[in-house]
Regions:
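TRNA-recognition modules of translation machinery and tRNA-sensing kinases, especially anticodon-binding
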Residues: 1-183
């Protein structure tokens, strides 16, 4: 994926407070360094109407990510967990609205199975609505035991944003009756 994205994509995938707290803006340009490749993967569909018969689209990406990590963080959060550049794997699904929660569940179960297959002690946490980012409908975290820190640390999260990004990016599909709907 590209390492930078245009402002219209950034505004389509996240709220302004999140953007201000996370994103590095390129001075004098309408460009931002990516905070996650998820944004560029979904952003590639801006202003598109997809063929509903070809949904779902499942995509994955591994990329460097750049974040301000603005805010007051404790000493325990220094190092690999609160750095300005890191590598990250992302998965997204573009699907019909009625399939969204099933895909969320599949991605979540696959993620849990992956960490369990490594025989790492893990626990699953469903995020309460007060902890969700502005556009998220539902989100869960996987935490794995860190022997070095002697505590569980977040290693994965899975979220669904409902139609929030599709609405903001104008990402649609034509159904079997030729009707245009949000993806």
């Amino acid at each position: 994926p590209p390492f930078m994205m245009h402002g219209d994509v950034v505004k389509g995938v996240m709220s302004f407070p999140e953007m201000d707290a996370m994103m590095y803006k390129i001075e004098g340009e309408d460009l931002y360094l990516i905070g996650t490749s998820e944004h560029t993967m979904i952003g590639r569909f801006i202003d598109q109407t997809l063929d509903g018969a070809k949904l779902p689209l499942t995509l994955t990406s591994y990329s460097p990510c750049f974040r301000k990590e603005k805010g007051a963080h404790g000493i325990e959060e220094r190092g690999i967990y609160r750095i300005h550049q890191f590598e990250k794997q992302e998965m997204i699904v573009v699907c019909k609205p009625e399939d969204s929660m099933d895909w969320y569940d599949k991605l979540w179960k696959n993620s849990v199975e992956l960490f369990r297959s490594m025989e790492s002690p893990v626990r699953q946490l469903e995020c309460c609505s007060g902890d969700l980012a502005d556009l998220k409908v539902k989100s869960c975290d996987i935490e794995a035991w860190s022997p070095r820190q002697q505590k569980y640390i977040e290693v994965c999260s899975c979220s669904t944003l409902g139609d929030a990004q599709a609405r903001r990016l104008r990402l649609r599909f034509k159904d079997e009756n030729g009707k245009t709907q949000l993806a």
